[in-house]
């Protein structure tokens, strides 16, 4: 089995992005699952173009996109993506779409194709804080989650897919007093559990 796991490049003046720091630290194989890692640009449209190319070439059994949610303290298991870009800040190429539809022929929203409640149970067993989240925002994270689920539906693919938000890691909060964070090792462990739980349930 093949799992495509994506993370983002740093954005908004951050020097690192915990999503890619964790994804790039995953082993290349977990049990009998081949782990394929992909770094996405934090850029509207270019991010899904790179993702779609990889989906076509790799043909994975599961796709888990990971992004940064600074200020959250837990692993956020995103339930739904909405068909709108409404950026509060500029992306890494200066784009700032406001109230723009992502795909004109797409549904208003798509639900995660990951077993998010079961994942939460498994993470709780090993004392990793997690929660089901009902909003992935309207920046590039929601953009890529929606695009992934749109692609799966549009192409009638029988694969699992969804999005996970992760907190800042230790290196990012040295100048941010009282800001929630999680160690990179804990995020990596969480991703391993998410991958296995998603594929085996």
Curated annotation (Swiss-Prot):
It catalyses: Release of an N-terminal pyroglutamyl group from a polypeptide, the second amino acid generally not being Pro. Disulfide bonds: none annotated. The keyword Membrane does not apply. GO terms for molecular function: pyroglutamyl-peptidase activity. The active site is at 78, 141, 165. Pfam families: Peptidase_C15 (PF01470). One of its GO terms (biological process) is proteolysis. It comes from the Bacteria. Homotetramer. Belongs to the peptidase C15 family. This is Pyrrolidone-carboxylate peptidase. The gene is pcp.
């Amino acid at each position: 089995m093949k799992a495509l796991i994506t993370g983002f490049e740093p954005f908004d003046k951050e020097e690192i992005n915990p999503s890619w720091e964790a994804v790039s630290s995953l082993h290349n194989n977990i049990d009998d699952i081949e782990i394929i890692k992909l770094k996405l640009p934090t850029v509207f449209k270019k991010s899904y173009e790179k993702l779609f190319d990889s989906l076509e070439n790799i043909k994975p059994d599961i796709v888990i996109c990971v992004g940064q949610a600074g200020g959250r303290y837990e692993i956020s298991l995103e339930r739904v993506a909405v068909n709108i870009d409404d950026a509060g800040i500029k992306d890494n190429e200066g784009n700032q779409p406001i109230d723009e539809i992502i795909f004109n022929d797409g549904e208003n929203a798509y639900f995660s194709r990951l077993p998010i409640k079961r994942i939460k149970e498994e993470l709780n067993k090993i004392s990793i804080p997690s929660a089901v989240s009902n909003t992935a925002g309207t920046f590039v994270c929601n953009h890529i989650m929606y695009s992934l689920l749109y692609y799966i539906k549009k192409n009638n693919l029988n694969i699992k897919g969804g999005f996970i938000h992760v907190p800042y890691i230790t290196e990012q909060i040295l100048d941010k007093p009282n800001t929630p964070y999680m160690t990179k090792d804990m995020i990596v462990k969480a991703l391993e559990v998410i991958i296995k739980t998603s594929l085996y349930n």
